């Protein structure tokens, strides 16, 4: 696959053109990632209301009927349901890893085996989160992890 970047003429808006014989999963995932990356989420904190880019978010977590977005150093309330975020970001780097958590897989630096066939994900900011065994196969597919067949 070739990638060509051209500067548009003055006054023209940015555009992305995809030329392919058949849009496969990889190309569609790339398109969805670009679209999701440009969208902003409204987030609330004690300091006020901010707009968050999805790439700033490490994970979402539902606690006591509220959903929070965890960024590198700040936590924000997101006034949407976890399942809505899952649908919004289903073809991007976000993946549900438990009943209450959706993680940005691009922020995972290490996966460590955990009790009862679960995994522990270590994120770029040092935080750790548990991947329920029910979601481990989805994560491995997303990360294209090969099974060790000894």
Where are the predicted features?
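Short, charged, intrinsically disordered terminal tails
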Residues: 141-150
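C-terminal structural segments of small proteins and small subunits
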Residues: 130-133, 137-139
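N-terminal regulatory/sensing modules of transcriptional regulators
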Residues: 1-26
């Amino acid at each position: 696959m070739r990638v060509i970047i051209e500067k548009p003429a003055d006054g023209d808006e940015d555009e992305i053109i995809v030329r392919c014989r058949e849009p496969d999963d990889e190309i569609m995932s790339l398109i969805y990632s670009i679209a999701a990356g440009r969208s902003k989420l409204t987030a609330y904190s004690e300091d006020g209301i901010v707009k968050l880019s999805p790439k700033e978010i490490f994970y979402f977590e539902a606690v006591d009927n509220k959903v929070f977005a965890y960024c590198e150093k700040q936590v924000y309330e997101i006034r949407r349901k976890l399942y809505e975020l899952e649908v919004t970001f289903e073809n991007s780097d976000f993946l549900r890893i438990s009943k209450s958590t959706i993680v940005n897989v691009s922020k995972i630096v290490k996966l460590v085996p955990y009790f009862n066939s679960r995994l522990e994900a270590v994120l770029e900011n040092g935080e750790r989160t548990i991947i329920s065994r029910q979601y481990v196969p989805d994560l491995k597919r997303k990360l294209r992890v090969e099974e060790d067949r000894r």
